[in-house]
Structures are given as structure tokens and as C-alpha cells.
Amino acid sequence: MALSRRGLLAGAVAGLTGCASRRVPVTAAVEPRTRARVAPVDVRRERVIRTIVGLRPYRPSGFRVAVEKLDDTLVIHNYGHGCAGITLSWGTAQLAVGLAAGLPERECAVLGCGVVGLSTARLLQLRGYRVTIYTKDMPPLTTSNVAGGYWSPVTVFDDDRLTPEFRQQFVDASRFAFRWYQSLASALYGVRWLPVYSLSTTGPFRPPREQSPYSEIDPLYPDAKQLGEAENPFPVPFVYRRMSMLIEPAIYLNALLGDFELARGRVEVRELASPREVAGLPEKLVFNCTGLGARSLFGDNELTPIRGQLTFLLPQPEVNYMTVGPGDIYMFPRQDGILLGGTHERGEWNTELDAATVERVLNENAAVLSGPSRS
């Protein structure tokens, strides 16, 4: 009988355990404390290739996944993801599609062709539905195309508006999305694992309090550690590293749309202006994934924009890590350019480029990314 290598090793360990006459303490392997190698980012005004502005759809009480009846049409809402639309898209799609379980309808409509609409449409197709997307804009003209793409469910709700019911929705959506994206990690979808370094000048990383939903989400990130002084390659005193995923919107949204069309999904470019027009669609099961558009379409005045401005530098393939901080700045190394942020201007509807913000973001990122300052 042939023994596998794993079986042989298991047997050997068992044999050694049986031969032991006393307990021997096991010493953990000592992790070498070498400085992380990070390629410098060439942050110069001359390397800027574009700056874009987007409005994220924020609700202080959190995203809305709920049912509403319009005459003989059932609308399932799925919008208001704040700064985590890409991050949470598969998770809230799972919640929304679950609300249709047991209904007889097998033909449905999805309103919106951003990341939330496409994710919802794909999950519906995978469960046997025939889906038509109605949308005002298609990629690359959606709000989702003006997103960073770092998997991190942040700026989703106000702490003082958190309810036990939403907390559970939020945790469930985060966990589901984190698992689903792992199945898509590939060049085809523009999804990859990268180390992300959280940079701070004020103190080391502190785990979320137990009452925070992030206490259940933070353990999802693998290979997390606070870097010691000898390991820290950045000119700030406190650096926390963990692994997460970068989802590149330009690649990812096109791939999702391609999957949808290959599965015989239909897209109709059409703007719907009122609930009456929604109720007039031939499909009587409708998923509303219109983001900030739900404010006017369904009268949700809780929706408010969070303005974000992103500046891109020429690509640097050798940069294979992300940074967040200090403060509100961040850097993501995408194929379409080195993305530098950021701004989080709540309640601001202006989509005009702000030159002073460009200079601030360049200067603050250059201070921590332009090369090693430690010997």
C-alpha cells in the first residue's frame, strides 16, 4: 500500500507523540524583523494624467435593502452604500435577491448598471432569472467607475444611527462580499490581493470595540500585524499592515457586463423619472440599484452625496502595495494609473475639479511615498 507524503508525515508525528515521555514546550518560530520592501511612488505634478470627481450615495442610517409595493409591481431596493459600493456590492445583492425567494416571477428588471446593479443582475442570473437592466448610464460613465476599488467597508453609516438589524445586515454583506471577491481574483476581472499599509502619526492600530460591527469584520483581513521600527519602510512612526483586495473598476465593470450579456441579459438605456414609470415596466419584480438617483426617483431625502476627488499619476508596475493615511490620503496602484486620494466632502454636490485639492493630495502623498527615509 502506497503512503502519501501527507500520510507519512502525519504518521511520523503521531509516532513521535506516542514515544514522548514528558511534555516538551513548543517554541514559536521567530519571525525575521526585516524592513518591508516597498517601491517608491514617483509623485510629481508632471506625472499627473487626470483628475476625476464622483459623488458617493450616502445614507446616515446605512444602505437600504427593503421591499416596496407599487401597484402590482414589487420593488426591492438596494442602494445607499456610501463609500463602499464596490466593496459591499455582492453582499447587498445577496440580501436583496434573498428577499425575492419564493416569489413566482422569473423575469425581473434591475435599475442601474453600476457595480451594485451588475452584481445584483448576475446573482439573479445565477439563480435562473431572466434579467433586463434599465439604466441611464453604462460603464465607463457610471459612478462606480469613479471609485478607488480598495476592498474596505468604510463610511457606510453614522455610528449613532446604527441599529441591531442593520448591524447584522452590514456584517453579513461584508462577509459574503469578501468571500465572493476571492473567487474572482484574476487578471480577467481586475481583482488582486495586495498588502495595504495603514500609516499613522498619532498611535498604533487599535482593534475595533466589541460593540462595533467592525469587530466582526476586521478578522477577515489575513496576515495583519503592527510593524516594528525595524520593519517600517515609511517616514511615519506607526504602520499597520494587512492583506486586502484591489478591484480595478475599468477592468472589473467591463468583465461583469460581459458576463451579464453572455448569460443573455438585456440592457436598455433609458432614464426612468418616476415611480409610475417604474410600475409601468413589463417586469413586475424590480430591483432598484440607482444609487444617488434613488433620491429623486423614489423620494429618499436621506440620501446625500459624499464628494470624492481622485488624481491619477502615470502607472508604475513595480508598485505592488496600497497605503491609507496619514489622515484622509491614500494610494492604490492600478493599471490605469497610480490613484491618489482623497476627499470625503459630505453634502457637497459640486463635481467641478478643485485645483487646491489636487496640490494638497500630491504634496501629502509625496511626503510618505516618494522614497525610503530610513537607513
Where would I find each of the regions flagged by the language model?
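Flavin (FAD/FMN) cofactor-binding and adjacent substrate-gating region
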Residues: G11-G15, V53-D72, S144-V146, S183-D259
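Glycine-rich active-site loop/strand segments that organize a redox cofactor
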Residues: M138-A173, E229
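N-terminal secretory signal peptides and thylakoid transit peptides that target proteins
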Residues: M1-G15
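Beta1/beta-strand and adjacent pyrophosphate-binding region of the FAD-binding site
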Residues: R106-G114
